[in-house]
Amino acid sequence: MRVADFSFELPESLIAHYPQPERSGCRLLSLDGPTGALTHGTFTDLLDKLNPGDLLVFNNTRVIPARLFGRKASGGKIEVLVERMLDDKRILAHIRASKAPKPGAELLLGDDESINATMVARHDALFEVEFNDARPVLDILNAIGHMPLPPYIDRPDEDADRELYQTVYSQKPGAVAAPTAGLHFDEPLLERLREKGIEMAFVTLHVGAGTFQPVRVDTIEDHIMHSEYAEVPQDVVDAVLAAKARGNRVIAVGTTSVRSLESAAQAAKKDLIEPFFGDTKIFIYPGYQYTVIDALVTNFHLPESTLIMLVSAFAGYQNTMNAYKAAVEQNYRFFSYGDAMFITYNPQALNERVGE
């Protein structure tokens, strides 16, 4: 399967650099999986598309201020992007510098270079960094870090991004990118969903910077997926099994919720899905057999990204590419701060030939 089959033309003007003034005020493109039919509306139309007893599964990760600026004590400027927090003293990070720091190198971090750290070891493309500070890592990041806006939002982060680039229900710090489908849910909408009898459950997947890495191979099967930490606790498993038992749908809010639920299903020994705590490298592309989710809320993704492949495996390749073509023609806003889709499962997607 060719990566190029997932390419599409996207005018620069359709990339959203700021969110809508109101979270739930974005547009919603609905794709009916079995028929490919498209419906245009606004995000609050979701209320009419869900039935009492349906289960929404959210990702409650919280974005950390993961981008740090500073310099090596020996001189050169550096930019650090945290991939994950290892413990209260250490991080695993990407480091941009004219010359990569060697183990033992001292780093001066923060806009005022007030934080001292040491590059301890290199792990392939990532650097293990230890802070020489009494405070825990998270406190240091909150003090000196910048919000890690995606590379396609071509502007410096602003104070407002600390809340805007965060879901209203975020709880567990650890992500370096927001689970963006969740950004559209505000408290009034969540309340109306609860009043309608919509069930809610929360997984955790700490989105890594790898989510922005381009696919650098020509053939999809050759791509090596990045690893991210996910948690699917017992209460989520119970909620999923209960929804299935009563004939309701499981609706994933975002591709990270999809990857969490499907990872837990793949690892399950007896039931459809069992609790899961650990790293996942699940790579979902056409031909993948979905086992848990019946519908999906998601944003519009980058051309040739692993996420448009995940959507194609769910909705069908042709349906997905047609929907994206329509979205471009209708001037939908793309990527993290952009508009959303609501997609129901297409059982024919499994047998569809891609690129034909």
From Swiss-Prot:
The keyword NADP does not apply. It catalyses: 7-aminomethyl-7-carbaguanosine(34) in tRNA + S-adenosyl-L-methionine = epoxyqueuosine(34) in tRNA + adenine + L-methionine + 2 H(+). It is an enzyme of class 2 (transferase). Coiled coil: none annotated. Its EC number is 2.4.99.17. Pathway: tRNA modification; tRNA-queuosine biosynthesis. Keywords: Cytoplasm, Queuosine biosynthesis, S-adenosyl-L-methionine, Transferase. One of its GO terms (cellular component) is cytoplasm. Transfers and isomerizes the ribose moiety from AdoMet to the 7-aminomethyl group of 7-deazaguanine (preQ1-tRNA) to give epoxyqueuosine (oQ-tRNA). Monomer. PANTHER family: S-ADENOSYLMETHIONINE:TRNA RIBOSYLTRANSFERASE-ISOMERASE. Belongs to the QueA family. NCBIfam families: PRK00147.1 (NF001140), queA (TIGR00113). This is S-adenosylmethionine:tRNA ribosyltransferase-isomerase. It comes from Enterobacter sp. (strain 638). The gene is queA.
